[in-house]
């Protein structure tokens, strides 16, 4: 007797070309096909590896130096990866030695800056390795054209989002943007998140931050992320706030679904 159970055709199969999401996986009897099971296990392994991948800060600093950008290497209060994962609060503050180094830098460079750019490994150093330099290339070119000033790029080992508040406060920056590896998903182990804050200081909650997420080749493009961040910077300085009271209403150009050309506006607000 032939015990082979064929995998039936799935009418949704064509939709898989439009999304990396796990849809139209098919079935063999009442189970998933072997290929889908193996793909899931592989994606799960990639996500776990992304969380534990060491932060190659030396390589990133060298790349920044090659582009003519100064950088500072700091460490959070979390001593290692294990403590970082177990104690999120320690990842939100700088180690005292790092905080003192920033104070000395600020004293040697008085006057403050418009923006402090902070880069932390977060939960995916892979995202930071892949996307930090390409994004900064697009963003800093446009920011310089608009006249914004910035401090040396600050790299924080074992850092979480809120550590940028302390960095910005110590540097006297009007604004901070944190580039951090987001929690890996099963289809996105390398998503970079941008967290923007106006008037940073220790103790701010997430309500005072704006998030631009999923910056990667398969997600939000570097150019669009830079466009949205610059919009937030301009509006934050004009209105002197950030977070839930500052909505992203940046105009974006998209292709009309009827192929009649381009249109502008925020599609989330039904404009254009």
Curated annotation (Swiss-Prot):
EC number: 4.3.1.7
GO molecular function, one term: ethanolamine ammonia-lyase activity
A Pfam family matched in the record: EutC
Cofactor note: Binds between the large and small subunits.
Record's subunit section: The basic unit is a heterodimer which dimerizes to form tetramers. The heterotetramers trimerize; 6 large subunits form a core ring with 6 small subunits projecting outwards.
PANTHER family, per the entry: ETHANOLAMINE AMMONIA-LYASE LIGHT CHAIN, ETHANOLAMINE AMMONIA-LYASE SMALL SUBUNIT
Functional summary from the UniProt entry: Catalyzes the deamination of various vicinal amino-alcohols to oxo compounds. Allows this organism to utilize ethanolamine as the sole source of nitrogen and carbon in the presence of external vitamin B12.
Name under which the protein is recorded: Ethanolamine ammonia-lyase small subunit
Organism field: Pseudomonas entomophila (strain L48)
Gene expressing this chain: eutC
């Amino acid at each position: 007797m032939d015990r082979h159970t064929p995998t039936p055709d799935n009418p949704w199969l064509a939709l898989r070309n439009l999304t990396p999401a796990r849809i139209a996986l098919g079935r063999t009897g009442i189970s998933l096909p072997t290929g889908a099971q193996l793909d899931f296990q592989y994606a799960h392994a990639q996500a776990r590896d992304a969380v534990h991948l060491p932060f190659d800060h030396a390589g990133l600093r060298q790349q920044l130096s090659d582009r003519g950008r100064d950088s500072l290497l700091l460490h959070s209060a979390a001593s290692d990866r294990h403590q970082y994962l177990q104690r999120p609060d320690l990842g939100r503050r700088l180690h005292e030695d790092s905080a003192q180094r920033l104070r000395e830098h600020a004293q040697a460079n008085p006057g403050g800056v418009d923006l402090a750019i902070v880069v932390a490994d977060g939960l995916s150093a892979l995202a930071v390795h892949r996307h930090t330099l390409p994004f900064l290339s697009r963003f800093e070119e446009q920011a310089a054209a608009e006249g914004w000033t910035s401090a040396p790029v600050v790299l924080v080992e074992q850092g979480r989002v809120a550590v940028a508040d302390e960095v910005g406060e110590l540097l006297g920056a009007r604004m901070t943007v944190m580039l951090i590896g987001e929690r890996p998903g099963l289809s996105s182990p390398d998503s970079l998140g941008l967290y923007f804050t106006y008037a940073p200081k220790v103790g701010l909650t997430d309500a005072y931050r704006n998030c631009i997420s999923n910056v990667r080749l398969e997600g939000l493009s570097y150019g669009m992320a830079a466009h949205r961040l610059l919009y937030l910077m301009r509006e934050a300085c004009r209105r002197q706030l950030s977070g839930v009271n500052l909505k992203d209403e940046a105009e974006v150009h998209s292709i009309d679904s009827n192929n009649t050309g381009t249109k502008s506006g925020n599609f989330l607000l039904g404009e254009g």
